[in-house]
Amino acid sequence: MPYEYFYNREPEQYVHYQMPSILFEDDNLRELSINAKFLYSVLLDRAKLSYKNGWLDDDGKVYIHYAQADLIKLLNCGRTKMSEYFNELDGDKGGVGLIERKQKVGIGKNDKIYVKNFAKPTNESISLLDTPQSPFDYFHN
């Protein structure tokens, strides 16, 4: 099927998932698979909506619900692969710690997922803390 070109401001009419560039630049995050990075971006997008809807726990932390079946369809993968992508992100499953899942309670309930802030690491060994003070510090003569 042939596709048309974009003209003028037409590209602005679409919703886009934003993928933080830090996922490709940070030493602790660049090893994530592209699908895990995309999954994090989708979850981050959902977290914005959850905040707008007031989905905060008692500590004020934003959480999301996302049906696994919907994510499987979005990423066009199977249940096993989706589990692998989640495990890459979930610190409790040996991943990088960008998400935390609280198990669902009851049949038909989705896990409560906390999408963590990549810009505010809690572990001082994370290389984000070594970020130069000035953007010009990246350049060397």
Can you say where each PLM-predicted feature lies in the sequence?
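Short recognition helix of helix-turn-helix/winged-helix DNA-binding domains
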Residues: 1-73
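Residues in well-ordered beta-strands of folded domains
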Residues: 20, 114-116
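Winged helix-turn-helix DNA-binding recognition segment
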Residues: 34, 46-113
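Compositionally biased amphipathic helical and low-complexity segments enriched in hydrophobic
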Residues: 40, 99, 129-130
